[in-house]
Amino acid sequence: MGIVAACAALAACAPAPITPAEAAKLRPADPKIAQLYDGACKACHANGNSGAPLTHDHAAWAPRWKQGQDVLLDHVVQGYKGMPALGQCVACQPADFQALIRFLADHEGETK
């Protein structure tokens, strides 16, 4: 019974899933990254019907984040499943993509 209660308590502490409306309100702190996000990422990552993981959706981003930032960067640059190559951001540099990935996964401010 103790294990069941502990699991229930942990589940109650988990953040509620983010909604597309909540994801649409999120913006990177850096103005340049915010502009790139608005122009290239937001249309899919704030749309619950796009198939892309929502911005700051911890449940969706956790397994991706565990793959490592280098893998995620490769997915963005090369394209992966529904993700178009370069994420439709031809103006983005590798550092921009890394900042966008950290923002999307709710790890903004972290480095490698």
PLM features: residue spans?
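C-terminal motif of bacterial Sec signal peptides marking the signal peptidase cleavage site
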Residues: 9-12
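Bacterial signal peptide processing site
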Residues: 14-17
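Short Cys/His-rich Zn2+-coordinating modules
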Residues: 21-29
